[in-house]
Structures are given as C-alpha cells and as structure tokens.
Amino acid sequence: NPSSPPVVDTTNTTSYPPMCSQDAVGGQVLENIPLQEDCLYNFNTVPYIVGIIPEDIIPVAIEK
C-alpha cells in the first residue's frame, strides 16, 4: 500500500525461543524457561491500549 509508512525496524524472531520480541535482550534471560505467547494478540492489542501507534497501522508478527 503506497500510503503506508515504511518499516523502520525489524527483529529476527526465529533466532530466539517462542516469545514476543518486545524486549529481546531481557528475553534472553528467559531462554531456558518454556514460554508460549500469542504475539499476534499482543502486538495488536497493547499498542492501542497505551496509544502508541495510529489506528491505521497494525504491526503483525508472523511465526513459521
């Protein structure tokens, strides 16, 4: 979509255990603890709650 802003920051989430990438450095402490998070749920709800991003921009994490 030409009206969408460019992606300015990405994180390779395939290099880490199953967890969302909000705090990759802090998350390394938890590497040995079995975690599962629904990143799609977290990315789509948290920014709207705290009002970080405009409503027309929806960050989505896709895990393979």
Curated annotation (Swiss-Prot):
Localization, per the record, is:
Microsome; Endoplasmic reticulum
UniProt feature coiled coil, ranges: none
Q: Which residues cross the membrane?
A: none
Q: Give the record's GO biological process terms.
A: fatty acid metabolic process
Q: Which GO terms describe its molecular function?
A: hydrolase activity
E.C. code: 3.1.2.2
Keywords assigned by UniProt?
Endoplasmic reticulum, Fatty acid metabolism, Hydrolase, Lipid metabolism, Microsome
UniProt entry tagged with the keyword Hydrolase: yes
Task: Choose one Gene Ontology CC annotation of this protein and give it.
Answer: endoplasmic reticulum
Q: Which residues are the signal sequence here?
A: none
State the reactions this protein catalyses: hexadecanoyl-CoA + H2O = hexadecanoate + CoA + H(+)
The domain of life is Eukaryota
Question: What role does this protein play?
Answer: Hydrolysis of a variety of CoA thioesters of long-chain fatty acids.
What family does the Swiss-Prot or TrEMBL record give for this protein?
Belongs to the type-B carboxylesterase/lipase family.
User: What do we know about how this protein assembles, alone or with others?
Assistant: Monomer and homotrimer.
Q: What is this protein called?
A: Palmitoyl-CoA hydrolase
Species source reads Rattus norvegicus
